[in-house]
């Protein structure tokens, strides 16, 4: 964002974005009486606020008027709002209300998709001006947002140069206007004039103005203003439209050369000013190399009867590869409660933002929210094929009953009314006006929205009811001056996330209401409405379709998380938790301070561990350095550490060092822990139980099917692993890989190794396998090492040609020692195929193929996995190691068995 912020500020005491633009003269006749400068200043404030709200999820413009009686807005304001949305349907995005001396404009969020008038595609952003110009025959035309959007989309699709097997780089198409030959009768007459070293005063140029030619005459009295106004429009217009010639000092009607008298202009100063004006023009590239705008500037003598009379200026502008602006676009957004202008680069990035174009997304995932139909700040959301769609998740979690008001989750509601006398009566009284919908309870809606929990809050409840706006209730144990601020902040965050994360495109607000459950009497309740504004009727949910659409956006808000693909794609993409994962994630941490989570291979245990640590920070108001994540191997430790949500260590480091400041511990891949360095479980319990305010969190994630050794794990007996939850929905692997996992899991269940507790594998019959994801499973036997390496290199080459990158590939061997053994042969084969370098799993974000051991890659994943000679010292755990190997592959798995077995 630009540092120079607009002096408009968001008012903090509302559960919505409310921008106060100060006093504005309203009424058509009143506005006509204003001086033009005041009328324009008032209009600019209102338009900036409207633009910022359209681009930031919607909200309210609040302005003061001089009279209390109702008055119309004014035609100039109405017309400017219509121009802003480029539609005559003003009510689609703006509605007005008046209360006393306050005039409110309710602004719905902008969203992509077709214009209703002509079905053309809306731009991603609203802008007061694009600052993009183009030639239109003899005129310079400013592009509106719709034209700018189409122009930028076209510029973003140049020829593509492939450099290497996986880097696709846009190659700019650079052109220059051709130089003409005076002897050629077909030569361009404008270029012939441009090549001259002088012009004659009064000379009539032999060509008219056209798309390629513009004539301008200037007065030296206003030279600075002329350069400031003319150059930033005409030079970008030529650059954006095939190039052209700007002749300054030629009358545009008569084509007569007039120049400027030598007494009134310094040619060197003129050159400097024009060059400075051109070099200041913002240029945005979609290509490499990023070359500057190219032009030729000539200051030539104008002769009168053979004597120097003055000077003329000629500028030849070459076509530009991408986009040249006159200045930064006039577009606004709300950031950190300030109204800020967008930089040119940010504006172009948001205008041209599209869903990721990745082969893997189309093969593995289904789109739940697309940028092509979402609000400006939304991100694309994908779910794994075979998993619940957002509509199915909404029906599972937040279904709207046919003719009554439902309280959910029922188990939480029962707990709350058993813990707090009078709560049921208080809630039922509040719900009397509503006959259909859903009331969603939470111990803390703030925590659900990634905000900090507030002490003294019994619960929050979100009402989604027919013929009502959404209402967030906060129920306090006793009166609290900060209770209303908490409720307002939570409602504000919920409303913003429903639009900007959940992609809701309807008119929406969330009213905030605070209730106090008096300890003296269960029937007494003190309440305070936080939002004094009366929203238009269109903000109420009219029926089932509207309620379900809003609840589907709520599903994305609550179940969405940053996809691990985001780092690979270079843009933020969201995935959704499964209903089973969300059920565990939504459990009260205060009531489940210790929990064992048994998850089958590919059920999302590590994702859950990361989500739980984020929740711990908000529930217990603790810093990241007070949460410890412990795993067995260093690559997974590094991967989690890079997220900056906790302190991450390996088991060995955990047992070796003291952790005086740690309050909460999350342990992952615990089935592969050992006791060789000490009692890790005992140490973890002692650390989390030493706090004076009560025990901290100790959650342990494990999967006995992936036990890769025969030593003692240090886990307590299965009967003591309580409370315990199970993740049985397999979400990672393609169908052929999932079937292979099923087969190997059945082998383990039939004949488990001696260190796997009896009964812990009985979760297998409950396994749910997501289907519908195509993939590959190849088991290639009886190959020499050289043949294996050639096969790996050839297969990688084919995948890279299809759009995959080295970040998608892992080559896994049995032990760390074998890595060096195979590395030389693999590199030799890769170099023959002109592929890439290798690295171990400690650098998962690097642009390279991972070569490491199966054990060190535990907890990580790649789309394409090669398993070379998987074997173990004891055959009893070979099926476990094969599961560890296979479950790392999301889509394509190639196994080269040792000795053909």
Curated annotation (Swiss-Prot):
What is expression of this protein induced or repressed by?
A: Down-regulated in small cell lung cancer (SCLC) cells resistant to PARP inhibitor drugs. Up-regulated by type I interferons, poly-IC and poly-dAdT.
The UniProt record gives the binding positions of Zn(2+) as: 285, 287, 321-322
Q: Which cysteines are joined by disulfide bonds?
A: none
Q: Which residues form the active site?
A: 216
Subcellular location per the Swiss-Prot or TrEMBL entry: Nucleus; Chromosome
Question: Its principal location?
Answer: nucleus
Q: Which UniProt keywords apply?
A: Antiviral defense, ATP-binding, Chromosome, DNA damage, DNA-binding, Endonuclease, Helicase, Hydrolase, Immunity, Nuclease, Nucleotide-binding, Nucleus, RNA-binding, tRNA-binding
* Enzyme Commission designation: 3.1.-.-
Report if keyword Nucleus is assigned: yes
Q: What is the effect of changing residue 209 to A?
A: Complete loss of endonuclease activity
Mutating residue 252 to A leads to what result? Slight increase in endonuclease activity
- Write out the GO biological process terms: chromatin remodeling; defense response to virus; DNA damage response; immune system process; negative regulation of DNA replication; negative regulation of G1/S transition of mitotic cell cycle; replication fork arrest
Cofactor(s) annotated in UniProt: Mg(2+)
Cellular component, GO annotation: cytosol; nucleoplasm; nucleus; site of DNA damage
* Phenotype for residue 234 to A: No effect on endonuclease activity
| Signal peptide limits | none
InterPro entries for this protein: P-loop_NTPase, Poxin-SLFN/SLFN_N, Schlafen, Schlafen_AlbA_2_dom, Schlafen_AlbA_2_dom_sf, SLFN_3-like_DNA/RNA_helicase, SLFN_GTPase-like
Q: Per the similarity annotation, which family is this?
A: Belongs to the Schlafen family. Subgroup III subfamily.
Its assembly, as annotated, is: Homodimer. Interacts with MCM3. Interacts with DHX9. Interacts with RPA1.
Relay the domain remarks: The N-terminus contains an endonuclease domain. The C-terminus displays homology to superfamily I DNA/RNA helicases, although it is in an autoinhibited conformation.
Q: Remarks, anything else?
A: Dominant determinant of sensitivity to DNA-damaging anticancer drugs: acts by mediating cell death in response to DNA damage induced by anticancer drugs. Down-regulated in a number of chemoresistant tumors.
- Task of the protein: Inhibitor of DNA replication that promotes cell death in response to DNA damage. Acts as a guardian of the genome by killing cells with defective replication. Persistently blocks stressed replication forks by opening chromatin across replication initiation sites at stressed replication forks, possibly leading to unwind DNA ahead of the MCM helicase and block fork progression, ultimately leading to cell death. Upon DNA damage, inhibits translation of ATR or ATM based on distinct codon usage without disrupting early DNA damage response signaling.
The protein here is known as Schlafen family member 11
* Source organism of the structure: Homo sapiens
